[in-house]
Amino acid sequence: VADYTYSSTDKLILNTTLTYSHDLIRVSSYIDIDSSKYTLDGIDFDIPQVESPFSHHRNILSWQTSALWTPIRWMMINGQYMFEHNDNRNVSTWSAGIVFNLLKKELKLKGSTAYNYRFPSMNDLYWRPGGNPDVKPEEGYSYDASISYRKSINKHLLFDAEVSGYLMNIDNWILWLPKDGNQWVWTPQNKRNVRSYGVELYGKTTFHYGELVSSLSGNYSWSQSRTRKKQHVDDNAYMRQIPYRPRFKWNLRWNIDYKDAFFVWQMTYTGRRFITTDESYATDPYSVH
């Protein structure tokens, strides 16, 4: 990694980074196969063929440059460009955003947009069984905006709150799904073009008194991630929630710190998640605490 930052004035900061990485994966299969595990309710499923061990590598060279400009004290504009060379494939991505600090920096407004491109991971490509060397990269555009508020109620009490929303249009979204109806082997697949949008709420109250610090925080998220194109006339997955993406999630967290002692309590709720593209099967909601 090589990194360089230059600032001619307090209003403009430039940065550039050059990164190289070498990924290596070695894959082998289990040799002993228990055929009884491929029989369910008297139905015999195909036993997979054992493939020979192999290794694969890839070289990734990425260059990133960014600029942060503060034309006036309550506004910041940032932009970023990244070029990536990944095994003879060249990709450019970018992002741009703006931040407004208002009411003596108690109120903050943010917005950004970006073009995203994600290569499949080595596990997506070569995990055994199920890796798919032909899976395509994801790409698309994203937009997000947020408003946050931070207020000191008094010398002991601090309040934080934020509301944010986002929209993403992604082509070739990668999902791990059963291969050709075989429930035993799942493989990454490019499942259509997806539109994902949602809202997130966050709040936190912090109490300070001497060496005692206590905070109570919580967040709630609602998201809709649907396919936006039909693959055929009778496509039952069209405009359905994509698998494994719950519409609702929330959590609460309570922290107490005093000198070298601490206490943490947390509760997380995850809503129903569909496990098929036509929403015919789903997991029940659950909570953990």
Give the label of every model feature segment.
Residues V1, R26-S35, R89-W94, M122-R128, ...:
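Outer-membrane beta-barrel translocator domains and adjoining extracellular loop/strand segments
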Residues V1-D3, D46-F54, Q80-H85, W127-V135, ...:
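Extracellular loop and loop/strand-boundary signature of outer-membrane beta-barrel proteins
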Residues V1-N90, E162-G165, G198-T206, V213-S221:
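Face-selective signature of the C-terminal outer-membrane beta-barrel domain
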Residues A2, N59-T65, S92-A96, G131-P133, ...:
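Hydrophobic, lipid-facing positions within transmembrane beta-strands of outer-membrane proteins
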Residues A2-Y6, R89-K108, Y143, Y149, ...:
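Transmembrane beta-barrel strand/turn architecture of Gram-negative outer membrane proteins
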Residues Y20-R26, L61, Y81-D87, K104, ...:
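Transmembrane beta-strands of outer-membrane beta-barrel pores
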Residues T70-M76, F159-N169, N190-D278:
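Gram-negative outer-membrane beta-barrel transporters
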Residues F100-K110, P137-Y197, Y202-T206, G210:
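Membrane-embedded beta-barrel scaffold of Gram-negative outer-membrane proteins
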